[in-house]
């Protein structure tokens, strides 16, 4: 079997406030991905500036940091075959108006500034984001009893 990879997924403050945490986790679990870490926290502005450092020169950066700091987030690490790419497909487009029904953003969002969820856009970004949000000992290694029913 091919190597499993990990991705970082964060439910943003609007997703938390709207009670979508369970629905989002359910979708990743039902797909067959394995949750290996999860935190419920209010991220500091400095932490968020580091997370979004690639966007620091964009005009929306201050508003993005303020929005992400406006309430709690659920930070997660999911593992599975092609989880980065598949996770991004499950999320839908960054702009919910461009997202298809059946995707998280297509089903639950209207505006880009309130798009409820973040997902790593590459394996390299995932590694960086996981390292930023979690200590190595917070990533739990276990074999899911469903593993053999999901993977050949």
Swiss-Prot record:
It is found in: Cytoplasm; Cell projection, Lamellipodium; Cell projection, Ruffle; Nucleus. CDD domains: NDPk_I. Expressed in the base region of the oxyntic and pyloric mucosae. ATP binds at residues 12, 60, 88, 94, 105, 115. The active site is at residue 118. Belongs to the NDK family. This is Nucleoside diphosphate kinase B. It comes from Mus musculus (Mouse). The gene is Nme2.
């Amino acid at each position: 079997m091919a190597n499993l990879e990990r991705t970082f997924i964060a439910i943003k403050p609007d997703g938390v406030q709207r009670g979508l945490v369970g629905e989002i986790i359910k979708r990743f679990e039902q797909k067959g991905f394995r949750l290996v870490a999860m935190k419920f926290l209010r991220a500091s502005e400095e932490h968020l500036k580091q997370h979004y450092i690639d966007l620091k020169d964009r005009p929306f950066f201050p508003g993005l940091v303020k929005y992400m700091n406006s309430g709690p987030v659920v930070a997660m690490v999911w593992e599975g075959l092609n989880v980065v790419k598949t996770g991004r497909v499950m999320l839908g487009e960054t702009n919910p108006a461009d997202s298809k029904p059946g995707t998280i953003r297509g089903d639950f969002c209207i505006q880009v500034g309130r798009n409820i969820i973040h997902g790593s856009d590459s394996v390299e970004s995932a590694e960086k984001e996981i390292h930023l949000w979690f200590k190595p000992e917070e990533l739990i290694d276990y074999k899911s009893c469903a593993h053999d029913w999901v993977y050949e």
